[in-house]
Amino acid sequence: MADTLRRLVNSSPYSVLQDKLDAWYKDYHVYSCDQNLNRCCELVELTSKIQGQLFTILNLTAQEGGHYSGVDTLKSRLLPWLGSCFTIAASAVSSDTSLSLIQESVEKDRKIRELSSVHESNLQKIEDQLCSTRIELDSVKRELVDTHIELDSTKNKSATTLLATEDEILHLKSELRVAQDQLDLYKRKLDVLDDYERQVRILRDEVSFLNAEKTVLQDRLARSRSPSPLLRRSRSVSPVRGESPTRAQLTSSSRHARLVSRFSDLYATERLESQSLLLKYIDDLETVQRILFIAAVESFQAAKLAYRQFKSRVRKTLSSTHIGPESLEDAVVDYIVRNLDLYDVQTSINDVINAMNVNPRISFPPEVDFVLISSFIREACRIAFAMQTLDPPLDLAFSSDGELYSDVKYRRSFDSEFTAPLVAFHVWPALLEGDTVILKGEAVTRRGALWKSRSRSSSPVRSRSGSPSRTFMASHSRSPSPGRLSSSRL
C-alpha cells in the first residue's frame, strides 16, 4: 500500500487535473462544442484513474486491517457516498435501471475473471511451450556441437587420407619413372640383342657359303689331281681361278657383322669414356653430347674422303701391273681389305679436329683441345674407313637440328620430351646400309627445338693456330701411299 501511495504522491495527479481545469476555463469560449466535450471527457478519465488508484489503496488498507477492521468506517463513509452516486440522477434513472447497472457490473466482473483465468491458462501453456522449445533448442545445440566435432574429425581424417594418397601418388610416380628407365634399358638391350642375332644370322650364312665354297674347291682340287690329260688341257684353257671370288667378297659378311659390332661398341664404350673425360672440363652435358656427335660425323666424312684418295692411288698403282681374271676394281678393294693398316688415320684425326674447331654449333674452353678425344676419333675413323670396303658401303644417316623425329632412325634419350615432334640435338647418328637403317641412333626431342637450333648457330668460330696438339699430331702423321710400295706387296 505504501508503494502505491508513494507513486500516487509522486505522480501528483491532482495538480495535473487542476492545470487542465485552468487551461480549459481560459479557452472555454474559444473552443467549439466538440472540443469542450473532449476536454470534459479527458478530465473525467483522469478523475476515474485517480479514483481507481484510491480504491486500490482503500482495498489494500482494508486487507491490512483484517476481516472486521474498518467496517464501521466503510459503512458510515463509503456506502452512503456510493448510494448518493446511484441516486444522483433519480429523476432520469429508475430503480430498475440502477439494478440493471449493478447486474451489468457483476456480469462484467465475472467476464473479466473468466478472461483472466483464460489468459492465465494460455500464459501457462505458452510458458510450457517455451520450456519445451528451450529444451529442444538445447538438444539441437548439443547435436550441433556433436556434428561440429564429427565434422572436424572427418576433416582431419580426410586430410590424413589426402596426405597418404599424395605420398602414394609420389611413390607410384617414382616407381613409374624407374620402370620407364628400366624399359628404356631393356629396349636398348633388345636392340643390341637384335643386332647380335642379325650378326649370328650373317655369320651362319657366311659359314654356309664358305662350306659350299670349300666343297667346290675340294672337288676342283680332286679333279686337278686326276691324271687325265683332257682335264689338264681344259684346265689350261679355262683356269679355275677365274671362277673363284676375291678375299674381300668371301669375307664381306663377316666383316659386315664385325664392323657393325665395333660401331655398337664405339657408342656404348668409347663414347661414354670420352663423355666422362669431357665432363671434367665442361659442365654442360648437352654440349658434350653435341661434341661427340659432331666428332663421329666428321670422322666418317674424313674417313670417306681418305678412302677415295687411297683407292685412287691404289688403282693408279695397280692399273699398270694388274693381271688376272678379276676386275681391276675388285683387285683394288681386295688390296685395301688386306692392307687396312696402311690407312693414314692420323691425317684424318687432324682433319676432324680442324673441322670441329670451325664448327659453329659447338663451343669449347680455350684451355682445352679436342685432342682429348683423339682416341675416340681414331676408332671412329678406322671403323668408317673399313665400312667403305663393304658392298654396299655403310654410312651415317643425314641429320640436322630441328628435323622431324623419326622412330625408324632414332631412339629418344631419357631426358627427352616424349610428345615433342622435333629433334633438339643428336646424341648418336644412325647407321645405314643403302637406304635401310641397321642401327638406330639416339636423339633428344624438345619443344621449340627449331628456334633453339637457330639461336645456337651464331656462336663464334674458334681459332686453334696456337694449339700445341697440332705439332704433336703432325709429327706422328705418315703417308702410306701405295706408290712407295714394291710390286711384291701388290
From Swiss-Prot:
Recorded coiled-coil stretches: 112-210
Region (Disordered): 224-253, 455-490
Functional note: Key regulator of mitochondrial quality that mediates the repairing or degradation of unhealthy mitochondria in response to mitochondrial damage. Mediator of mitochondrial protein catabolic process (also named MALM) by mediating the degradation of damaged proteins inside mitochondria by promoting the accumulation in the mitochondrial matrix of hydrolases that are characteristic of the lysosomal lumen.
Record family assignment: Belongs to the MIEAP family.
Main location per the UniProt record: cytoplasm
Superkingdom to which the source organism belongs: Eukaryota
InterPro entries tied to this protein: MIEAP, MIEAP_C
Protein encoded by which gene: spata18
Keyword Membrane included in the entry's annotation: yes
A GO-annotated cellular component: intracellular membrane-bounded organelle
Molecular function (Gene Ontology), one example: cardiolipin binding
Claim: Signal is one of the keywords in the record: no
Any single GO BP term: mitophagy by internal vacuole formation
Entry's localization field: Cytoplasm; Mitochondrion outer membrane; Mitochondrion matrix
Matching Pfam families: MIEAP
Name this polypeptide is given: Mitochondria-eating protein
Organism: Danio rerio (Zebrafish)
Amino acid composition bias (Low complexity), ranges on this chain: 224-241, 456-490
Keywords: Coiled coil, Cytoplasm, Lipid-binding, Membrane, Mitochondrion, Mitochondrion outer membrane
